[in-house]
């Protein structure tokens, strides 16, 4: 068995080499370069086709032999989505990876490298990096240096360009994978010895945060489910990038609660000229799908919480807030609201935007 595996690996390695050098190969080439009979070479070709290691590029015709190409064992990309939102001179970059391990690796090294980034955190396979426009000189390489880091963030028209400096494995991601991610407009790389730098171009989008509450009744509906349905609905548009769906607990002493008194929050990035239409569509969708007439929606555009947001969120977690107070807070801070009593909790959801999961779910944690 070991001998068969060694032979297989040797033949497959040759096939990959010929594919890289010539674009394809024939059975005769494999037979000649390995010294095995042509019939044996054909058997190996058939076997490796069945294993999906190689594919038939063109069938034989007349005196022209069939030609084959080897498929790499490496995935085309682990970078699912890369996009960015902009608010003044602040930027948040989002990188959704198919591997939690790779996302953790990038978070660790990007955070160590610092640069223009002020905050680097991971939410599952989504890496969120916040920073300001600017550039720094940062070394990458073997430990104890970080292997990869963001060294520059700048804007050119409607594009955000963040420059990544990398060494080793991350260089492969930069040169071979990132350009395939949804949201990437272009990747321009350059190499200097063992260091690879790349400019990653994405569109400058707007961050939209929507809070929802009181969309259900004791016997029908669930606010968390309707919030997620809205995020899915918006995500089907080409101009929207879904980011997150969260649940936050509020003061349990509210008599009108349907259960434990929670509200929901969704985040997404959208093209700036579509935001107004998205807001109108979202309000219409919630109004039509809510089981309760007291539904409420609150919408904030931008990266940052308005002043006094955490104070409002803290009140909603510890006491009753009147609808008049909620309306005054929304008006003073440019937050759109619509609906009935639910705007109180919807505003609380927006006010708690940016808190970690444990804080969102435990009202006893001080803000």
Where are these regions (language model features)?
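Short acidic, hydrophobic short linear motifs in intrinsically disordered regions
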Residues: 21-33
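A short, conserved structural fragment
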Residues: 49-60
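Minor-groove-contacting beta-hairpin "wing" of winged helix-turn-helix DNA-binding domains
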Residues: 60-71
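Long alpha-helical, hydrophobic tracts
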Residues: 29, 168-294
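Positively charged, polyanion-binding regions of nucleic-acid-associated proteins
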Residues: 10-20, 207-209
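Short alpha-helical segments that sit at the start of domains
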Residues: 1-15, 37
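Extended, charged/glycine-rich binding lobes that contact polyanionic ligands
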Residues: 78, 82-165, 173, 180-181, ...
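Short amphipathic alpha-helical interaction segments
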Residues: 6, 35-50
């Amino acid at each position: 068995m070991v001998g068969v595996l060694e032979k297989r690996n040797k033949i497959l390695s040759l096939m990959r080499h010929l594919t890289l050098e010539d674009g394809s190969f024939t059975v005769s080439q494999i037979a000649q370069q390995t010294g095995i009979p042509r019939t044996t070479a054909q058997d190996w070709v058939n076997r490796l086709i069945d294993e999906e290691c190689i594919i038939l590029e063109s069938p034989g015709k007349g005196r022209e032999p069939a030609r084959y190409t080897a498929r790499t064992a490496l995935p085309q990309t682990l970078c699912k989505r890369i996009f960015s939102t902009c608010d003044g001179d602040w930027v948040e970059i989002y990188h959704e990876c198919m591997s939690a391990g790779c996302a953790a690796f990038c978070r660790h090294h990007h955070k160590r490298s610092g640069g223009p980034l002020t905050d680097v955190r991971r939410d599952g396979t989504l890496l969120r990096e916040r920073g300001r426009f600017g550039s720094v000189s940062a070394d990458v390489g073997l430990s104890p240096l970080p292997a990869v880091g963001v060294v520059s963030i700048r804007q050119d028209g409607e594009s955000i360009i963040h420059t990544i400096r990398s060494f080793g494995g991350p260089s492969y991601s930069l040169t071979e994978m990132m350009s395939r991610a949804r949201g990437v407009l272009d990747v321009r790389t350059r190499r200097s010895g063992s260091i690879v730098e790349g400019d990653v171009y994405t569109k400058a989008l707007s961050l939209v945060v929507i809070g929802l509450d009181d969309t259900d009744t004791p016997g029908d509906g669930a606010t968390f489910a309707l919030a997620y349905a809205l995020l899915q609905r918006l995500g089907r548009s080409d101009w929207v990038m879904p980011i997150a769906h969260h649940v936050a607990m509020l003061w349990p002493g509210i008599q009108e609660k349907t259960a434990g008194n929670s509200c929901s929050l969704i985040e997404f990035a959208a093209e700036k000229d579509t935001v107004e239409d998205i807001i109108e569509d979202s309000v219409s969708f919630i109004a039509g799908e809510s089981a309760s007439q007291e539904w409420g929606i609150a919408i904030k555009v931008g990266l940052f919480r308005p002043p006094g947001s955490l104070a409002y969120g803290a009140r909603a977690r510890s006491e009753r807030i009147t609808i008049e107070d909620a309306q005054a807070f929304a008006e003073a801070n440019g937050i759109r609201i619509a609906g009935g009593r639910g705007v109180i909790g919807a505003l609380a959801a927006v006010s708690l935007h940016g808190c970690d999961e444990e804080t969102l779910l435990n009202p006893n944690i001080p803000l």
